Curated annotation (Swiss-Prot):
The gene is thrS. It is found in: Cytoplasm. This is Threonine--tRNA ligase. Binds 1 zinc ion per subunit. InterPro entries: aa-tRNA-synt_IIb, aa-tRNA-synth_II, aa-tRNA-synth_II/BPL/LPL, Anticodon-bd, Anticodon-bd_dom_sf, TGS, Thr-tRNA-ligase_IIa, Thr/Ala-tRNA-synth_IIc_edit. Keywords: Aminoacyl-tRNA synthetase, ATP-binding, Cytoplasm, Ligase, Metal-binding, Nucleotide-binding, Protein biosynthesis, RNA-binding, tRNA-binding, Zinc. GO terms for molecular function: ATP binding; metal ion binding; threonine-tRNA ligase activity; tRNA binding. GO terms for biological process: threonyl-tRNA aminoacylation. It catalyses: tRNA(Thr) + L-threonine + ATP = L-threonyl-tRNA(Thr) + AMP + diphosphate + H(+).
Length: 691
């Protein structure tokens, strides 16, 4: 489960303020005051400034020469990030106040909040979080000053941090990890919390900053949970305790965020997967490996079948490839050079032995495939290809396996075994732009068919430390994707260094019903794999040419898409996807036979329908099937049977009584056949009532 970043009421997340001048020798805070800008107590209070080089500065910053700065308000993304980082410091101070033996890890701001890692003797309990939150409120009320201090040398820092082993490790850190807020600036610095009256140091932390002026500039915060976490995310390192929290520019914004968290918890696909009997993760199978139950299997089948139909209409050819392959294939593709950490260990098989146990023929390493693209390259290469065959669009629901660390495995949205709706398109350079344009339209149209309609694009470019091919090839591929993305009319956000090792990509980012952003489809342009695999086609002039390869996963994976849709619809899938589309609920046992006749008629039209013959009372049956998110509930009592009718009952408790049987069947069949994504209600379902 994740929760979206939300702008404050009335704010758009941007900072509309104009630059101001900070005279040499004057604090930024003084210039803010001189300009008449709010400094505390309002959602748009200025918390830091950005200098001409784009660096965020404390309000206590004093430039050596006149400087033009942009004020950063609390209700902007940067402003919230600074508030959250400062709140993380307050949390760390509170932890060391209440747990003096605690050692400090890292404490960065993250989307919608912050966390801090600690080495402690026992895991934190809910009571501990309450006590810590109480102590934090005391610190906020005290108005402690955040005071930046520069270490004269690393030796001075090491001496001061002698009892903080994790901070000592960070003194020499050069990883560039964005979560490491302690170092990374031009200087090695600490931030001390000072008593506002005496200016005595109360507490401090290794940190590059920036921070808000005082703890009173934290308007609203809350601790949300704790969990175990490996130091620096590496399971080979020590296991620490992580406390998560959130902080906002106003109590109103915090309250709105808490409401979103609570709604996200209600929609959590892991919770709904159990309640609706959709899927599970048996311990006997292993972490990140899902099994789909019959109801979940129906939803999955419908997702796949509709996708297959659309791909057939769009000219794709269906292929299939095995789950394991010799190591050499992934040497050729480059996966073992650039992606080995994401692959499961090899299996050595096919060895032959002599009678005395000595090896006659050594075995070979085989790998579970992490991607389908190398195998699709082999399909293309299996015979000679002509320009007349291009573009060649290959499509597969291919199951792949990726070694995700146990700490990041999360329900269906981060798994180890996943089925990708994987397409690879081979085309000429002349066809490339048109193919990308039509592909992007196809992706957006298909996602819209499933009820996801709020999109923007992200352009991921080369990681300078992790790529194959020449700079010229990467530049051409990146420019083409940027051109196609811009033509789409959607917002195109840069993602520097975010591409896979073989080519740049456009990813379709989707917002769900709660406004959360999910990366969905990816489109990657690849000039490198055709060269690595020696792919060629015969051009119109008889010469041998290399095709361009386009990688595309539309859902990302079936599992992840299933989880996202479950949360988007809060488990109430559109009727065309619902595992049970209609249920007959008799008032009494004598009405069962009639409802079974109605059900038989619906089944003849392909409707997935059941009749509840349990011993429960009708009211309890209605509650049960409402909780099971069945879109159409059909009630029948004496009057309905006599009139050859049913009464519709919907999940929002609305009802249509006395609907003639034929009209009821027609309405349900019509709703499903039109693939309506809205939840049916008495207002939306147009049907003639007999009453």
């Amino acid at each position: 489960m994740s929760v979206p970043a939300q702008p404050a009421p009335g704010a758009d997340g941007g900072d509309p303020r104009q630059p101001i001048r900070v005279p040499a020798g004057t604090t930024a805070a003084a210039a803010i005051g001189e300009a008449g800008l709010p400094r505390r107590g309002a959602p748009d209070a200025i918390v830091v400034v950005r200098d001409a080089e784009g660096k965020l500065r404390d309000l206590s910053w004093v430039p050596d020469a006149d400087a033009e700065v942009t004020p950063i308000a609390a209700n902007t993304d940067d402003g919230r990030s600074v508030i959250r980082h400062s709140t993380a410091h307050v949390l760390a101070q509170a932890v060391q106040d209440l747990f003096p033996q605690a050692k400090l890890g890292i404490g960065p701001p993250i989307t919608d909040g912050f966390y801090y890692d600690f080495e402690v003797l026992e895991p934190f309990t809910p009571d501990d979080l309450q006590a810590l939150e109480k102590r934090m409120r005391q610190i906020v009320k005290e108005g402690q000053l955040f005071d930046r201090r520069v270490f004269e040398s690393k030796d001075q820092a090491r001496e001061e941090l002698a009892n903080e082993p994790y901070k000592l490790e960070l003194v020499d850190d050069k990883s560039g990890d964005p979560d490491v807020m302690e170092v990374g600036g031009d200087e090695l610095t600490a931030y001390d919390n000072l008593n506002p009256r005496t200016r005595e140091r109360v507490w401090g932390d290794l940190c590059r900053g920036p921070h808000i002026p005082t703890t009173k500039h934290i308007p609203a915060f809350k601790l949300t949970r704790s969990s175990a976490a490996y130091w620096r995310g590496d399971q080979k390192n020590a296991s620490l305790q992580r406390i998560y929290g959130t902080a906002w520019e106003s109590q109103e914004a915090l309250d709105k965020h808490i409401e979103l968290i609570e709604e996200a918890q209600r929609r959590d696909h892991r919770k709904l997967g159990v309640e609706l009997d959709l899927f599970s993760f048996p311990d006997e199978i292993g972490s990140g490996l899902a099994v789909f139950h019959p109801k979940g299997g129906i939803v999955r089948r419908e997702l796949e079948d509709y996708s297959r139909r659309k791909h057939t209409e769009a000219g794709y050819q269906f292929v299939n490839s095995p789950h394991i392959t010799k190591a050499q294939l992934f040497h050729t593709s480059g996966h073992l050079d650039w992606y080995a950490d994401g692959m499961f260990p090899p299996m050595q098989i096919d060895a032959e032995y002599n009678a005395d146990g000595t090896v006659r023929k050594p075995g070979q390493d085989y790998y579970l495939k992490p991607m389908n693209c190398p195998m699709h390259c082999l399909i293309f290469r299996a015979r000679g290809r002509s320009y007349r065959e291009l573009p060649l669009r290959l499509f597969e629901f291919g199951t792949v396996y990726r070694y995700e660390k146990s700490g990041v495995v999360h329900g269906l949205t981060r798994v180890r075994g996943l089925t990708m709706d994987d397409a690879h398109i081979f085309c000429t350079r002349e066809q490339m732009r048109d193919e990308l344009r039509s592909l992007l339209r196809f992706v957006l149209d298909l996602l819209s068919d499933y009820g996801l309609t709020d999109f923007y694009l992200e352009l991921s470019t080369k990681d300078p430390d992790k790529f194959v091919g020449s700079d010229e090839v990467w530049e051409e591929a990146t420019n083409v994707l940027a051109e196609v993305g811009a033509e789409s009319g959607l917002e195109l956000v840069p993602d520097p260094g975010g591409a896979a090792f073989y080519g740049p990509k456009i990813s379709v980012q989707v917002k769900d019903a709660l406004g959360r952003t999910w990366q969905m489809s990816t489109i990657q342009l690849d000039f490198n794999f055709p060269e690595r695999f020696g792919l060629e086609y015969t051009a119109a002039d008889g010469t041998r040419q290399r095709p361009v390869m386009i990688h595309r996963a539309l859902f990302g994976s079936i599992e992840r898409f299933f989880g996202i849709l479950t949360e988007h619809y809060a488990g109430a899938f559109p009727a065309w996807l619902a595992p049970v589309q209609a249920v007959g609920i008799p008032v009494a046992d004598e009405h069962v036979a009639y409802l079974e006749q109605v059900a038989a008629q619906l089944k003849s039209h392909g409707v997935r329908v059941e009749v509840d013959t349990s011993d429960d009372r009708m009211a309890k049956k209605i509650v049960h099937h409402t909780n099971q998110k069945v879109p159409f509930m059909l009630l029948a009592g004496d009057r309905d049977v006599q009139a050859d009718a049913v009464s519709f009952r919907f999940g929002d408790r609305t009802q249509i009584n006395g609907v003639p049987r034929e009209a009821a069947v027609a309405a349900i069949v019509d709703w499903i056949s039109r693939r309506e994504n809205a939840t049916p209600t008495a207002e939306l379902v147009k049907v003639d009532s007999g009453e």
